[in-house]
């Protein structure tokens, strides 16, 4: 994923749409992310499966883990987050620069949200339609949900101990000092 952010920068992209390869994100729904970015410019727009009239339903253990993760992430980021594992994003160029320098490898969505907020970037969520998974398997399965949750919570806790990296901060990048 980080290589994609770096390539987008090298190509001069002002924005990048990121979506998971499991078929859950209908590409046509990207219009909603773009409309949100035009209406209220921000650094990241996340397509959330938990919007008004959502028909998304995961198994009970997944729903419980994601609700707990969303609550914890919302608290540490001081921003309401409903879908901490969504891989459907519209990323602005300044945030691309940050992610080209720093991007988490283990639990990228939740850790990236914590990272971008720590570095001073802003984000919004927009409800989008999600389809059932078309390919692959979720990394969050019923038996492994507790293990997944424990690892993500630990990663987020450790992330809170890190200081802001000036090279990847919103203030530094938006003043035109970043590569």
Residue ranges of predicted features:
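Hydrophobic alpha-helix-in-membranes signature
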Residues: 25-26, 126
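Hydrophobic helical membrane-anchoring modules
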Residues: 6, 76-79, 101-179
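A ubiquitous, low-specificity "background" feature that marks scattered single residues
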Residues: 16, 26-28, 89, 115-117, ...
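The conserved acidic donor/metal-binding loop of glycosyltransferases
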Residues: 20-24
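Acceptor/aglycone-binding surface of glycosyltransferases and processive sugar-polymer synthases
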Residues: 1-11, 15-17, 27-106, 133-152
